[in-house]
Design a protein with these regions (language model features):
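C-terminal domain-boundary segment and adjacent tail
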Residues: 44-78
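Positively charged n-region of N-terminal signal peptides that target proteins for export
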Residues: 1-5
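Bacterial N-terminal signal peptides
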Residues: 6-15
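Sec/Tat signal peptide C-region and signal peptidase I cleavage site
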Residues: 18-22
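Short hydrophobic/aromatic-rich motifs at helix boundaries and adjacent loops
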Residues: 23-26, 70-72
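Metal-dependent polysaccharide deacetylase catalytic core of the NodB/CE4 family, i.e.
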Residues: 24-40, 59, 80-84, 92-149
């Protein structure tokens, strides 16, 4: 497992470094769920997320909220070198239980794009409206995904 995490970190570094240096551009990393190995194609392990956070907070990157990236680009402003945004799709519960505490502790902004139908049906694998409000009130940005995904 440790070798896999290092492999992901090496790939992440190799992908981010040259692309994030382009003038007035940003790389957006997109996640779905965390610590849910039964969904390997969309899962990020806790160890992988910790490695990504360590890399993103190493001082080599400028992590910005997606709203700020878009606002600066729309204003014709140049983004800082190596700008990175973080996006999480769908609104799975593991965002609240695993990712948010780690990202918050690291001071990394991120945007969650919610598929509201799952929340309205009170799916046990998805965030609740109360959890969404709690995260929003703590500074997490939310965007629209769709109703039914």
């Amino acid at each position: 497992m440790k070798a896999f995490v290092w492999g992901v970190l090496v790939v992440l570094t190799g992908v981010l470094a040259p692309v994030a240096e382009a003038a007035s551009s940003a790389v957006v990393l997109m996640y779905h769920r965390f610590g849910e190995p039964e969904y390997p194609s969309t899962n990020t392990t806790a160890e992988q997320l910790d490695a990504h956070i360590a890399e993103l907070t190493s001082g080599a990157y400028n992590v910005m909220a997606l709203d700020d990236i878009v606002a600066e680009l729309n204003a014709g402003e140049a983004l800082p070198d190596r700008t990175v945004g973080l996006s999480i799709d769908d609104g799975y519960l593991s965002i609240y239980s695993l990712a948010w505490p780690r990202l918050k502790a690291a001071g990394l902004p991120f945007t969650v794009f919610i598929a509201t139908g799952h929340i309205d049906r009170r799916s046990s694998r998805h965030l609740s409206w109360d959890q969404i409000r709690e995260m929003r009130d703590a500074g997490v940005d939310f965007g629209h995904h769709t109703v039914s995904h």
